Amino acid sequence: MKLAVYGKGGIGKSTTSCNISVALAKRGKKVLQIGCDPKHDSTFTLTGFLIPTIIDTLQEKDYHYEDVWPEDVIYKGYGGVDCVEAGGPPAGAGCGGYVVGETVKLLKELNAFDEYDVILFDVLGDVVCGGFAAPLNYADYCLIVTDNGFDALFAANRIAASVREKARTHPLRLAGLIGNRTSKRDLIEKYIEAVPMPVLEVLPLIEDIRVSRVKGKTLFEMAEQDPSLDYVCDYYLNIADQILARPEGVVPNDTPDRELFSLLSDFYLNPGKPQVPNSEEELDLMIV
């Protein structure tokens, strides 16, 4: 099974991806997480350091694939999750999608691509150009990470459009949305009224999720020292269980940009009844 995780830049895709990977491993699956971001920090939470990228390794070997060994590019992370970072071209040059293609090509050359029960692609940002939509060509399911905010849902809508386009020629389905660090879900609910799709889980607004990223540890690893975090791990285990059940998923219908802008902004600015935010937790959406 191959998964592609997308979402607005900075929404918490890598943290979410790492915890889902560990949850899948705890369900007895052999998991490979592939970071598809030039920042090459997708797997930092699993390994605790920035691992060398495939592109760096290929450059060192003068692009002689036969000189690359699995241990040169595949690193063991927490929970037994194997980790790969695709890397990227020099800033302002080249195509990230090409890098993803080279990564898959090398892993196939190493006979590694088919050794895993689950391969998870963690893909950069919300700009789903043809290049960075490349992981969708390999994926069975797409997962979109969002929050209860306007911008994240706007990005989710564009990603949904990419899933629909790829599904024309590939057996790809959208598994659903994952709400990350949000105390409310009213805008999420409003969005899925317009664009029906499952919501796999909505993670609570707790600082430990953000802290885990800085520490370079998954929530599961942190919970070993602080059992009070076990309940957070259960959210990721629930997502893993839903994915392993091989859901039917959907081929989404995106809403035109202007229509979605109007829908969400009107809902936010004109709620059904007056609401006065009384804490930081309720300020999930900020329009600037």
Swiss-Prot record:
Amino acids binding Mg(2+): 14
Catalytic activity of the protein: chlorophyllide a + oxidized 2[4Fe-4S]-[ferredoxin] + 2 ADP + 2 phosphate = protochlorophyllide a + reduced 2[4Fe-4S]-[ferredoxin] + 2 ATP + 2 H2O
Needed co-factor(s): [4Fe-4S] cluster
Biological process (GO), any one: photosynthesis, dark reaction
Binding site for [4Fe-4S] cluster: 95, 129
Family as reported in the entry's similarity comment: Belongs to the NifH/BchL/ChlL family.
Protein name from the UniProt record: Light-independent protochlorophyllide reductase iron-sulfur ATP-binding protein
